[in-house]
Amino acid sequence: MESAERLVKNPGWTSRVAQAMRGAGGMLLDLAYPPVCLNCDAPTSTPDVLCAICFKALRPITAPLCPVMGLPFEVSLGPDLLSAEAIADPPPFGRARAAVLYNEVARTLVSRLKYGDRPELARFCARLIAGAGHELWMGDPILVPIPLHPARQRERRYNQSGELAQALGKLTGLDVDADLVRRIRKTRQQVGLSGDGRQRNVAGAFAVHPDMLVRSRGRRIVLVDDVYTTGATTKAVTRTLLKAGAEAVDVVSFARVVIGAELPI
């Protein structure tokens, strides 16, 4: 009886007990399922991280880089120097940034996030994206994930780009609008297609929400994706947004394929 009265008179005590029980349960889970590296499954001290060896194997993309495409340069030749790609084929978006080069470790993370039913991996990837895209967060833009076709999203259970955008929104404090762009045509997967084939594959595949202008309210849009390969998908989405009246679009991704640097996709 005394214990029951204590619960009623001191609800804070109840919450502390519940918190302690949750903590004990967490420790039991850690003992039964100890945290492991997101890439190689080696034991780690905390969950949702890479071990020291795998983390060192990641290739972060840092300055000097192309101010438009975000491609890394070996040496700095000035802040306004553009890459050959940006000069030969100027993109419809303003800037693209990526956290890491697409290599073995990055491929495993993306594959597990995308096809392995591991949405929690988005939290780790988003932490790296938040740093790599820091200059894109100025001016309070809206984060918009590259959409999946509804049928494909049902197959995978979630949109990996949507998970990245939500995790990134929590880290940066930026708004996320997952419904601003829709994929209206189910396309082939881009893996294995040529650059031209990728462009044809996504042509006419996207549409914006009818209230896009109201929802964006003149704010810049930052598209969020897992891997930037040729840019066919992000360029198609960007053109769709600009045609509908968006003022400006930037792009951010976890990994970036750089020809000759690491792995093809």
Model-derived segments and their meaning:
Residues 1-265:
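Glycine-rich phosphate/pyrophosphate-handling loop used in enzymes and phosphotransfer proteins
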